[in-house]
């Protein structure tokens, strides 16, 4: 029987958690939405729906712009898939990150118009802004789905982690985007409330263009 077990309303995020949700119900709810809000995560009967607010979205979008700027400057091919629903019925798991990218697998997946995660890999790099506690352990969820690298921001600082033998290990810089460090990203984000976004990205581009 499906039941609401938690509701969290906060400044950066609103979350609702349901338990006892069948896979087919989750898929139907996901397909009936307009757009990608609320963002959904599903893990063996537990469904979490999260609606981000301004600060959450601003952090996620800025990180995404830095990833795209860095890949352009360093000539690294990527495929952006934003908050695509990554779902595996065989695992009874699904997630929608703030930003998602193929890097290592970009060339392989370039010709594909649609993704089938029963045969296609999960995104190589996902960005997860989590300013309030999730009812689902996202790192375990990402690991089970085979995400190679996770950038996680808690509203204060960024942590980068790589998947090693099924467990995420912290690292100071990205493997998918070599040379880009968490400290560089945090430096830009620390100025987001005092400097306009265009200026931030222009300055970031100038610093990495050498």
Each model region followed by its residue ranges:
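Gly/Pro/Ser/Thr-rich low-complexity, intrinsically disordered segments predominantly at protein N-termini
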Residues: 1-210
């Amino acid at each position: 029987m499906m039941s609401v077990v938690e509701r969290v309303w906060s400044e950066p995020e609103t979350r609702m958690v349901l338990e006892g949700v069948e896979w087919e119900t989750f898929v139907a709810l996901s397909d009936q939405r307009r757009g990608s809000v609320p963002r959904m995560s599903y893990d063996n009967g537990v469904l979490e729906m999260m609606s981000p607010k301004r600060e959450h979205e601003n952090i996620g979008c800025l990180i995404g712009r830095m990833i795209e700027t860095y890949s352009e400057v360093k000539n690294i091919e990527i495929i952006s898939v934003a908050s695509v629903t990554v779902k595996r019925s065989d695992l009874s798991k699904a997630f929608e990150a703030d930003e998602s990218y193929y890097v290592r697998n970009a060339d392989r997946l370039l010709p594909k118009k649609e993704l089938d995660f029963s045969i296609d890999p999960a995104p190589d790099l996902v960005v997860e802004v989590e300013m309030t506690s999730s009812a689902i352990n996202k790192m375990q969820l990402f690991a089970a789905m085979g995400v190679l690298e996770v950038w996680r921001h808690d509203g204060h600082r960024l942590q980068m982690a790589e998947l090693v033998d099924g467990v995420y290990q912290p690292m100071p810089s990205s493997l998918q985007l070599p040379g880009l460090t968490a400290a560089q990203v945090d430096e830009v984000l620390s100025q987001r409330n005092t400097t306009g976004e265009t200026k931030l990205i222009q300055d970031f581009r100038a610093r990495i263009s050498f």
